[in-house]
UniProtKB/Swiss-Prot annotation:
Family: Belongs to the FAM228 family.
Record organism: Bos taurus (Bovine)
Superkingdom to which the source organism belongs: Eukaryota
Phylogenetic lineage: Eukaryota, Metazoa, Chordata, Craniata, Vertebrata
Name recorded for this polypeptide: Protein FAM228B
InterPro entries the UniProt entry points to: FAM228 (IPR040046)
Gene: FAM228B
Length: 264
């Protein structure tokens, strides 16, 4: 299309064409110019749309990459909070726990050395509990100088632990009794076994150690007797008839009987 921005400004209005001039056939060069302008306009429109689509596609791809990177950051943060940090704390506690034990042992050793320096000798058979009692702390605290390791809670199973804690709290609210996690597991196990059909003295409700500790009279119980009757088999009975095989001699013996030797 022609642009009139650079055209010189004149005071005269452009001359209007008459109808005859409009109806007269235009020269070929004029038609080529119009066709070229239309083609250029179409090309410019296509290029504009192409650039717009490319920009929108780049924007969508960048947004998709941003979401993926953000998702990875959130997953890594959750892993650090629920797995890495608790595990690191447990390791640090186990590594630094020897300091308290070392301090308590040093106190015991200092008390023993003071007593030896005072008395000159120290024997386990002859000691005065009023002056020095090596078993005082053991009587006061049975866990003295003993390392107690709390139950390890696997960070990877945190969801299961939270679920068990919730069930245990509900059970405590229903019964009014405080349950430890071990007692709660036993109650859950009993509830699970109660769903199965009740078979007296059945082995599927026992562990191998419980099965070994069973009393001898279990063998004579009614349940075991019925089980043995079901699988009772007489191994002396057989469906194979041995009489025909006994009557017919071996072929080699038949040949020997047919061979007759005469002496003259």
């Amino acid at each position: 299309m022609k642009s009139y921005e650079n055209d010189p400004i004149t005071d005269k209005l452009p001359k209007l064409k008459s109808s005859r001039e409009w109806l007269e056939p235009q020269p070929l060069s004029f038609m080529e110019v119009l066709a070229k302008e239309d083609v250029d306009t179409a090309i410019q429109s296509i290029l504009y749309r192409e650039n717009y689509i490319i920009k929108e596609l780049d924007k969508c791809l960048k947004h998709h990459d941003f979401l993926n990177a953000r998702r990875k950051e959130i997953l890594y943060k959750r892993w650090v909070d629920h797995v890495a940090d608790p595990l690191q704390k447990k390791i640090i506690e186990k590594v630094t726990s020897y300091k308290k034990i070392k301090k308590r042992r040093q106190e015991e050793l200092d008390g023993f050395l003071k007593y030896v320096n005072k008395k000159g000798n120290a024997f386990i058979e002859h000691y005065d509990p009023k002056e020095y009692d090596p078993f005082y702390m053991n009587r006061e605290n049975p866990n003295f100088l003993k390392v107690t390791i709390p139950p390890f809670r696997d960070p990877l199973k945190k969801a299961q632990y939270d679920k068990d804690d919730g069930k245990r709290i509900l059970l405590q609210c229903e019964t009014g009794k405080i349950y430890t996690m071990k007692e709660f597991k036993e109650v859950e196990k009993a509830k699970l076994h109660s769903r199965f059909p009740g078979i007296s003295n059945s082995r599927h409700l026992m562990t191998p150690n419980e099965w070994i500790r069973l009393p001898p009279n279990y063998i004579e119980s009614e349940f075991c007797k019925r089980s043995r009757l079901k699988i009772k088999v007489n191994f002396n009975e057989s469906s194979f008839d041995l009489k025909p095989s006994v009557r017919t001699p071996h072929p080699e013996f038949q040949k020997e009987d047919k061979a007759v030797h005469y002496k003259f």
